[in-house]
């Protein structure tokens, strides 16, 4: 019985240590989440402005027609997917949701292998490579608060692959942050640009100004920046969802550890009570034997 008591006590101590670790990790993820949510809000200011300017410029461009490859739909022979996952685990179902969604799409629409994957995150890269899938580029070791400079190259490569007709449409697949408990899988078309309509532009915008050198040349410079900003925004959004998933997973782990500790404590008390009862019984039996 003493051995049993010591074993239970050791389990309680071990679980308490685990609970402290998961609680600390939850607080770290919570702090990262707050910073990511602020970064996402700050980015939306820039994203809204560049969208307004781009849409305003396209008001007349759509009227006269544009041959910019980023605006022109062409027959789809191959599709590109930017897939955003985490670099580490301990984030609950964050990675499994997006990877399942991507696999379902590829199974349904790309049985002939007419796709390219641009993978951001080690979990996704390892997953796709282990299955022999078409991974064109990958980015590992993304910072908790990624800067545009860190992702500029892989984003630019993705846009260039579309412009150079390596694939004919580009989607970004990621977990959209809703709140600390919820995220939603998003598969968002980035290229060709098709969701900018003239009535989205502000009533007073750059259409009232003379532009140098001309609208066409400005759009050639602006459209890649606009698309790259959308992809970067998706990365920030995905990182925010990742931190929320990590916080939730660690909170769940902490709660489970506390439940285990409670169960072990009850088990320990019962075992201790049984041991004491047995000792008393033995003492009484010994005393009776002496009479």
From Swiss-Prot:
Signal peptide: none
Gene Ontology CC: plasma membrane; proton-transporting ATP synthase complex
GO molecular function annotation: ATP binding; proton-transporting ATP synthase activity, rotational mechanism
InterPro entries attached to this UniProt entry: ATP_synth_F1_ATPase_gsu (IPR035968), ATP_synth_F1_gsu (IPR000131), ATP_synth_F1_gsu_CS (IPR023632)
Main localization of the protein described in the UniProt heading: membrane
Cellular localization per UniProt: Cell membrane
Keyword presence, Cytoplasm: no
Domain of life: Bacteria
Membrane topology qualifier: Peripheral membrane protein
Gene Ontology terms: biological process: proton motive force-driven plasma membrane ATP synthesis
Ranges that cross the membrane: none
Disulfide-bonded cysteines: none
Keywords per UniProt: ATP synthesis, Cell membrane, CF(1), Hydrogen ion transport, Ion transport, Membrane, Transport
Subunit structure: F-type ATPases have 2 components, CF(1) - the catalytic core - and CF(0) - the membrane proton channel. CF(1) has five subunits: alpha(3), beta(3), gamma(1), delta(1), epsilon(1). CF(0) has three main subunits: a, b and c.
Similarity comment text for this entry: Belongs to the ATPase gamma chain family.
Function: Produces ATP from ADP in the presence of a proton gradient across the membrane. The gamma chain is believed to be important in regulating ATPase activity and the flow of protons through the CF(0) complex.
Protein name stated in the entry: ATP synthase gamma chain
Phylogenetic classification of the source organism: Bacteria, Bacillati, Bacillota, Bacilli, Lactobacillales
């Amino acid at each position: 019985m003493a051995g049993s008591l010591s074993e239970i006590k050791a389990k309680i101590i071990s679980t308490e240590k685990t609970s402290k670790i998961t609680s600390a990790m939850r607080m770290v993820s919570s702090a990262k989440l707050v910073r990511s949510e602020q970064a996402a809000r700050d980015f939306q200011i820039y994203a809204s402005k560049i969208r307004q300017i781009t849409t305003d410029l396209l008001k007349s461009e759509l009227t006269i027609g544009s041959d910019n490859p980023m605006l022109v739909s062409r027959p789809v022979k191959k599709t590109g997917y930017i897939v955003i996952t985490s670099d580490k685990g301990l984030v609950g179902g964050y990675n499994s949701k997006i990877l399942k969604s991507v696999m379902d799409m590829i199974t349904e629409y790309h049985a002939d292998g007419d796709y390219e994957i641009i993978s951001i995150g080690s979990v996704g890269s390892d997953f796709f490579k282990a299955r022999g899938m078409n991974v064109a580029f990958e980015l590992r070791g993304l910072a908790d608060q990624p800067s545009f400079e860190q992702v500029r190259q892989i984003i630019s490569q993705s846009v260039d692959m579309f412009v150079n007709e390596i694939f004919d449409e580009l989607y970004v697949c990621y977990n959209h942050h809703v709140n600390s408990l919820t995220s939603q899988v998003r598969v968002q078309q980035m290229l060709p640009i098709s969701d900018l309509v003239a009535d989205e532009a502000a009533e007073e915008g750059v259409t009232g100004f003379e532009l140098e050198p001309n609208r066409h040349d400005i759009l050639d410079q602006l459209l890649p920046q606009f698309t790259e900003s959308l992809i970067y925004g998706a990365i920030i959004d995905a990182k925010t969802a990742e931190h929320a998933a990590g916080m939730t997973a660690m909170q769940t782990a902490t709660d489970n550890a506390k439940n285990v500790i409670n169960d072990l404590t009850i088990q320990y008390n019962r075992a201790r009570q049984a041991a004491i009862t047995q000792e008393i019984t033995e003492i009484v039996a010994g005393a009776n034997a002496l009479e």
